[in-house]
Amino acid sequence: MQQLQADFRDPRCVSPVDFADHDAPSQIVGNVEEHGFALVDMADAGPPDARIAALSTALRLGEPYIPALYRYGETKDYSAPYSDIRSEPTDRHPGFSTTAGQIWHVDGLLDDIGEIKTTILYCVRAAHRGGDTMLFNSLAAFAELREKDQDAAEALLSPAALNRRSTIPGIDVNATGPVFSVDDNGDLVTRYTDNETCTWDYSAGPPGGLRRALDFLRTATDDPRYRLAVRLAPGQALVFRNDRLSHGRQPYEDKPDARRHLVRALYAEAPRASN
């Protein structure tokens, strides 16, 4: 897997692909395979949903995926295929509607590890200050850990290691599973999350392994080889492998008449170029 050798200090990581190029889909797929993500300039103006749909069609992603958490009656307001992410004081969603930062997570709190393979974020309007999307190459960090401390890495593979619970008011649901796993193709996948949704079972795996593993990963999130801040400009999209990267958000400030506005779509397929 190329992403295991990625170095986020390389400025080519954030070199955007022009979606108008005839070979843009191949460029995007190549960047995603190499780095886990691709930045895309969507030059043509139009409704955000239409721009994301054009991008997802070019990448053969299929229809947007609705996460399991949003299939409950109490969460139906968040079940749209395209989710608006902007500050809204009357909204109770702990991530979409606040200007606060978001700590490392993967999308799909209740979904099986590797189920949601792709996230697209499209920028309608950038924040006045802050609001960068943070990316963490958790797979590469895990590969380094596995070389240095096999017992710690084994603890992260335990099916009891990580429980994630909903923090949406009134929705008492949770899911337990490994932090890393190997999919049917033999590739590493992740659900590394380290935020207020998490409960860790330190008895999982070899004694002391999970604590050492978390110490290692938390240190790795500050390593510039693995950590990157991406500030999207209006009309840009970020395509990333939700099953191979963890992500977060810097806190931000809005102007009263110009709120930061991103639109998100999730997919169960990985990007593929046309034959």
Curated annotation (Swiss-Prot):
Where does this protein act, in terms of pathway? Answer: Antibiotic biosynthesis
Reactions that this protein is recorded to catalyse: UMP + 2-oxoglutarate + O2 = uridine-5'-aldehyde + succinate + phosphate + CO2
Q: Which Gene3D superfamilies match?
A: Clavaminate synthase-like
- Entry keyword set: Antibiotic biosynthesis, Dioxygenase, Iron, Metal-binding, Oxidoreductase
What top-tier enzyme class does this entry carry? oxidoreductase
**What cofactor is this protein dependent on?**
Fe(2+)
Task: List positions binding Fe cation.
Answer: 105, 107, 247
Tell me the null mutant phenotype: Inactivation of the gene abolishes A-102395 production.
Q: What does this protein do?
A: Dioxygenase involved in the biosynthesis of the capuramycin-type nucleoside antibiotic A-102395. Catalyzes the dephosphorylation and oxidation of UMP to generate uridine-5'-aldehyde. Can also use the alternative alpha-keto acids pyruvate and alpha-ketoadipate (2-oxoadipate), with very low efficiency. Cannot use alpha-ketobutyrate, alpha-ketovalerate and oxaloacetate.
Q: What is the recorded name of this protein?
A: Uridine-5'-phosphate dioxygenase
Task: Please name the source species.
Answer: Amycolatopsis sp
